[in-house]
């Protein structure tokens, strides 16, 4: 038992001697340091230290045993955890009290009375002490006050519509900086970053509408355009003598009405009824010239009278004379 006490005493922390020395070396160390201490005092100190050490360990063991026992009982029977429930309720109340200030902040639309109050507070404290202003303005945070002022209430805001020059600069700035609206807004004095961002989206929506509408117009024109001849060289072989003129319609504009099928190789009988109906539709000469891009071919039709056209066509259609009997012309 004395040996155990001696070993335990070596672990004690005292200001007179280090813990690594034994009881005999303690006495020698104390003589060198001029500490007056008898062997009885050392022995009593060793006993006191060892008893305190064991009592401390016993207390810790009892505390841990009671702690685990109580938690095991709470797990087995939840009704016994009144104390823990009370603590949980207390912490819940504390947390709810800590968040009560955030819950009281209003997040709705700003009312005119609030705008007026904010203007008065900014005039007094300046546009920088937003937390102090929020304390004077019930229900609003400092961030909300700052955003409301710089985006809506600041008298330096430019509320005029964007000009074409500003729109061009905005598109160039966006190509350089991307979606960094605060940096882009610095290039437009009086414009907020929010207004710059919104107008960029307006420009993009407008361009999208224009492109889609022009695409629809082109598609409609292509669907209404007449059938194009797959052999373009046939247009160079245009022969006015093959025109099957059925009638000459006179109008106020004095434009000649011509049928479409007036090209070599056109077979009217072999066409399907749908193609015949489409080709039989009449077409204005001016539109036809624009379609074929051969305006010089039709100049004589606009300059010659109706009777001259008939006479010339009839003369060219006469078959050549062959003297089979050798009698000559009569």
From Swiss-Prot:
Q: Which UniProt keywords apply?
A: Developmental protein, DNA-binding, Nucleus, Repeat, Transcription, Transcription regulation
Q: Which CDD domains does its entry note?
A: SANT
Question: Where's the DNA-binding part?
Answer: 130-152, 181-204
Report which superkingdom the organism of origin falls in: Eukaryota
InterPro entries recorded: Homeodomain-like_sf (IPR009057), Myb_dom (IPR017930), MYB_TF (IPR050560), SANT/Myb (IPR001005)
| Annotated SMART domains | SANT (SM00717)
Q: Does the keyword Nucleus apply?
A: yes
Report any one BP term from Gene Ontology.
regulation of DNA-templated transcription
Name listed for the protein in its UniProt record: Transcription factor MYB105
**What species is given as this protein's source?**
Arabidopsis thaliana (Mouse-ear cress)
**Gene name, Swiss-Prot/TrEMBL:** MYB105
């Amino acid at each position: 038992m004395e040996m155990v006490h001696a070993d335990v005493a070596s672990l004690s922390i005292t200001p007179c001697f280090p813990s690594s020395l034994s009881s005999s070396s303690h006495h020698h160390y104390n003589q060198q340091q001029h500490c007056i201490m008898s062997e009885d005092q050392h022995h009593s100190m060793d006993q006191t230290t060892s008893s305190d050490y064991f009592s401390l360990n016993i207390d810790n063991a009892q505390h841990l045993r009671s702690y685990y026992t109580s938690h095991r009982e709470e797990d087995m029977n939840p009704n016994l955890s009144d104390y823990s429930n009370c603590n949980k309720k207390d912490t819940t109340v504390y947390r709810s009290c800590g968040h009560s200030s955030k819950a009281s902040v209003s997040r709705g639309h700003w009312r005119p009375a609030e705008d007026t109050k904010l203007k008065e507070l900014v005039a007094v404290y300046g546009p920088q002490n937003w937390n102090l202003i929020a304390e004077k303005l019930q229900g609003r945070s400092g961030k909300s006050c700052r955003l409301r002022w710089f985006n809506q209430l600041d008298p330096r805001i430019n509320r005029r519509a964007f000009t074409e020059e500003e729109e061009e600069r905005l598109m160039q700035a966006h190509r350089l900086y991307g979606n960094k609206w605060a940096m882009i807004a610095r290039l437009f004095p009086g414009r907020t970053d929010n207004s710059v961002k919104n107008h960029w989206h307006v420009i993009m929506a407008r361009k999208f509408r224009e492109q889609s509408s022009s695409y629809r117009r082109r598609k409609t024109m292509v669907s209404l355009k007449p059938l194009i001849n797959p052999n373009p060289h046939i247009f160079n072989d245009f022969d006015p003598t093959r025109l099957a003129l059925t009638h000459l319609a006179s109008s106020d504009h004095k434009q000649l009405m011509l049928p479409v099928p007036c090209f070599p190789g056109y077979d009217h009988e072999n066409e399907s009824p749908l193609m015949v109906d489409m080709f039989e539709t009449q077409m204005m000469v001016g539109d036809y010239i624009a379609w074929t891009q051969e305006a010089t071919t039709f100049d004589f039709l606009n300059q010659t009278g109706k009777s001259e056209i008939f006479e010339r066509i009839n003369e060219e259609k006469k078959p050549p004379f062959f003297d089979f009997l050798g009698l000559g012309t009569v």
